Regions:
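Extreme N-terminal, non-catalytic leader segments
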Residues: 1-20, 44-48
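Hydrophobic anchor at the beta1->P-loop junction of P-loop NTPases
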Residues: 23
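Structural recognition of the conserved hydrophobic beta-strand(s) that form the central parallel beta-sheet
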Residues: 148-152
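ATP-binding Walker
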Residues: 28-29
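Conserved GTP-binding G-domain of TRAFAC-class P-loop NTPases and closely related GTPase folds
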Residues: 181-317
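Conserved substrate/cofactor phosphate-moiety recognition/catalytic segment
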Residues: 16, 32-139, 143-146, 159, ...
């Protein structure tokens, strides 16, 4: 792994280093406080540009109450995917060194909150055209390494995997930080909030949450669990190492090919088993039909044979 000096990108003529960090954990685990502190430290100590996207600040207020461990309503899920699309538009502008345009299909209130989020962190400036639909990137956004920290519960693995797919699409660094906080502490903190979630929601999420599992999911190998509320000096060093590793080892397209091949292999195997099952079912069905037909035809054929025998005997007599 390269040193922190290399990761700053100073004097480098290569492409800008970009990373996505998924910050996940139960509600009131301390994620937002942690994200702000991490952003400040990375800017001060590393000179990196940091963009903290707190989902609670960008998602429409009407849907914040839906952030529970129940199955995601379709509209809520679509809004999460829409926010990822906003992030992709920002990343495309950074990667291509151009203005950031607004997506044609957007939720206006959420888009405005996203723009405010970027402006407040000095990453974009005012609209660059009369239509107010494109924005200029600031020098901060393009002059060195840039880390996007996504602050949300991300309690389902599938939610985090969508972010990983975005990192893979553009060969970005990717890592996950899980804030491990006791259920009791989360409930206590939540109770002190002006807009507290129902306690049963946090209890349910505590049972449903899918923590990062690097042993099971190869794409989650760059993950770190930190005990909240305290972050020890040792954990702080591990966190820095995690972020540096992510920047210096972006997700490669070859990983996409390997995963796709594995997916294709599983699909192929599933199809073969399905075809074999269908063939077996047809054979069994045909065999049963033939057996049933024989049972139905048997007595009638035997009766006709007897009649023929009797008639022949009478004729001979």
């Amino acid at each position: 792994m390269k040193t922190g000096e290399d990761a700053r990108g100073e004097g480098s003529t290569g492409p800008q280093k970009l990373g996505l960090c998924v910050l996940c954990g139960l509600p009131a685990a301390g994620k937002s406080t942690f994200a702000r502190a991490l952003s400040h430290r990375l800017q001060q100590e590393r000179g990196w540009a940091v963009c903290v996207v707190a989902y609670d600040d960008v998602m429409p207020d009407a849907f914040l109450r839906e952030a529970s461990a129940r199955p995601l309503p379709s509209q809520w899920k679509l809004l999460r995917q829409e926010l990822l699309k906003y992030l992709e538009y920002f990343l495309m502008a950074v990667i291509n060194g151009c203005q950031m345009s607004a997506p044609p299909d957007r939720t206006e209130a959420m888009w405005e909150d996203f723009i405010t989020c970027l402006k407040d962190q000095n990453l974009i400036s005012s609209a660059a055209c009369e239509a107010q639909s494109c924005y200029l990137l600031t020098k901060t956004a393009v002059s060195g390494p840039l880390f996007l920290i996504l602050d949300d519960n991300f309690y389902y693995q599938s939610m985090r995997y969508e972010v990983y797919q975005l990192a893979r699409k553009y060969s970005l660094g990717f890592c996950q930080v899980f804030l491990d906080c006791s259920l009791e502490t989360c409930l206590q903190r939540n109770g002190q909030r002006p807009q507290a979630l129902p306690a049963e929601t946090i209890h349910l999420m505590g049972r449903k949450i899918e923590k990062p599992n690097p042993e099971k999911n190869a794409w989650e190998h760059n993950s770190l669990t930190i005990q909240s509320p305290a972050c020890s000096p040792e954990a702080s060093l591990k966190l820095t190492d995690l972020l540096l590793t992510a920047l210096e080892n972006p997700v490669k397209c070859v990983e996409d090919n390997v995963e796709q091949k594995e997916t294709d292999r599983i699909t192929c195997s599933t199809n073969i088993l399905h075809q074999a099952d269908q063939t077996l079912r047809r054979i069994v069905s045909q065999t049963m039909k033939e057996a049933k037909d024989k049972e139905t035809e048997g007595p009638s054929a035997h009766h006709q044979e007897n009649q023929h025998t009797v008639g022949t005997t009478t004729l001979v007599s």
